[in-house]
Amino acid sequence: MGDILRDTADPQTPEELCRLYRSLTEQLRDQLQRIETDKQDLESQMLERISSLESRNLELREQIRQAEADKRYIETQKIRYEREVRKLKSESEQLRSPPLIIGTVVDVVDANRVIVRSSAGPRFLVRSSPSVNPDDIKPGARCTLNQQSLAIVELLPSSFDAQVYGMELVDSPQECYTDIGGLKEQINEVREAVELPLKRPELFTQIGIEPPKGVLLYGPPGTGKTLLAKAVAHETNAHFMRVVGSELVQKYIGEGARLVRELFDLAKKKAPTIIFIDEIDAVGASRTEANTSGDREVQRTLMQLLAGMDGFETRGDVKIIGATNRIDILDKALLRPGRFDRIIEIPLPDEEGRLSILKVHTRTLTMEETVNLPEIAGLTEGKNGADLRAICMEAGMYAIRNERPAITREDFLSAIEKVRLDFSHSPTDSEGRMFA
């Protein structure tokens, strides 16, 4: 304003004074407009700058969050890698450490000294590591020995052959006594010899007698020997170990005897246990002069079986059930008291027994009222339980073939005739064969 007044000459007249006033007013208005424009430009620039700074702030915050997440991930990875490094170092140290010798404890002399037998054969009097509990060191225990001092480093768990573990049925048999027909007397004898000692041992203690150690079931094929053994295991809730006699016959010397020994050891460990040896005649045939190495190996396996049954060591709640259809060829040593204390014959069922078996197998069948089970039992003389089951199945197949909703008397008669023809034909005949 002062500059404007200095640049203007002094007014002489009123007109000049008015012109001067108007000029000054216009100049001031122009300056105010320029100032307002500059102000708006400055505000716009400031707003843009603030917006840019806010965007940058958000970007930096996002980068900080990402950096923190990366930091946490890296720390986690670091911990995992450190753990793997420690594990690898431990494995490396174990690989660099000398191997240990496998041995067996023979005798415990005192709290600090133990007699062991190494895998090479010699026996040594050694000491045990302080980390080994002295109460766990017992004769027969497997252990590891230091190569230099032969001191006991640690105890190993007992080892059983995988084939022996395969003999144990994980699931308890589902068969029960009601699934067995025509063997009422035999069931009672087996229950007295096997089930009663496991469930009520105090009865034998009261009377003062030892319970039977084993039961031998013999009779023609298909009469229910295996079924009876499964029913006993089901009723006693005992571990059931099933082995076929031929499985105990091995190729190499001593393998069969080792399997028998481990079978008894595992049975004692899992007591109460029922060992069922099916087709025991495969390993228990009468001993004769062995002409081949295979015959001698079978005899060695039989002797180990006899030793296990003799009870040199108490077997606890372990019962043995043997089954065979050739009792005439069994070794006499197997049949003496103290091994198989009860020898029970499982004969072919009579007419009453066949009727009982038919009732068991027809419980779930849909039959017409014309079916007379006593009549069918009379027509199946000489048939065993397996034959009667096959007859029931064949009768059902005839009903399905003829699209009938239920089995008729004629279906059973046709099934009886078919089963009879199946047994009369040779195995190579193609006519009259059974469905299954």
From Swiss-Prot:
ATPase which is responsible for recognizing, binding, unfolding and translocation of substrate proteins into the archaeal 20S proteasome core particle. Is essential for opening the gate of the 20S proteasome via an interaction with its C-terminus, thereby allowing substrate entry and access to the site of proteolysis. Thus, the C-termini of the proteasomal ATPase function like a 'key in a lock' to induce gate opening and therefore regulate proteolysis. NCBIfam families: PRK03992.1, proteasome-activating nucleotidase. Consists of three main regions, an N-terminal coiled-coil domain that may assist in substrate recognition, an interdomain involved in PAN hexamerization, and a C-terminal ATPase domain of the AAA type. Residues 15-97 form a coiled coil. This is Proteasome-activating nucleotidase. Residues 434-436 are annotated as: Docks into pockets in the proteasome alpha-ring to cause gate opening. Its main location: cytoplasm. Homohexamer. The hexameric complex has a two-ring architecture resembling a top hat that caps the 20S proteasome core at one or both ends. Upon ATP-binding, the C-terminus of PAN interacts with the alpha-rings of the proteasome core by binding to the intersubunit pockets. ATP binds at residues 222-227, 361. PANTHER family: 26S PROTEASOME REGULATORY SUBUNIT. It comes from Methanoregula boonei (strain DSM 21154 / JCM 14090 / 6A8).
